[in-house]
């Protein structure tokens, strides 16, 4: 039986992924602020440390898979605290358990907003990636508009790309990848769906509907499985065609 940890397991994509994996026979350790095996607030260093300690206590023999799905929208500094710093603390903190697992795989949840948000300030992304959380939260508070979410998700995707090929990850037998969902119908996004689908010239969704959490869960289950054994450092888009529609010719970009 595989043992897999999912943060954000109480709702949305995390809950759908839990359901999918448990139906496949996996033992799932859920992490959330409610209705989970491990109750933890990933917005704070103390909460992250408590999460790592609790998961370690429950998984003495190691982890075979990890999904860093905890995330929020709304308050800008809190978005960065949870969606970036909470995610990398999860990935780094549980990496020793993954190293003891079998055919281990970790997947972070990024977003297609990383490539489809006009005017996203890359300097904010760089500040987040630099790793000083206090400075990153301060910079986020000063940033215009609602750039915290895409900036945090872009920083997370780049963190995954930087770390996946390194000895600490693939060198230890751990595959690290990310996915970039588009508009998914979850409790977190329900208030935004009508607006998003009212501006097709700005934010097209060629498939014509929001995605379902179970569709993303299927992708995550695949990336966690041995069938995805050649994936390392990939950021897989599942967004109904939005990224392709707005970036038709600027991906892939040839190496300089």
Which residues fall in each region the model found?
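N-terminal Rossmann NAD(P)H-binding glycine-rich loop of SDR-like oxidoreductase domains
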Residues: 7-10, 14-19
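Rossmann-fold cofactor-recognition segment
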Residues: 33-50, 55-56
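Short, flexible catalytic-loop segment of classical short-chain dehydrogenase/reductase
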Residues: 180-191
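Structural signature of the Rossmann-like NAD(P)-dependent dehydrogenase/reductase core
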Residues: 6-7, 68-69, 105-111, 175-180, ...
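Short C-terminal tail/terminal secondary-structure segment
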Residues: 232-256
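C-terminal helical subdomain
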Residues: 89, 148-150, 154-157, 178, ...
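Catalytic loop of short-chain dehydrogenase/reductase
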Residues: 71-76, 99-171, 183-184
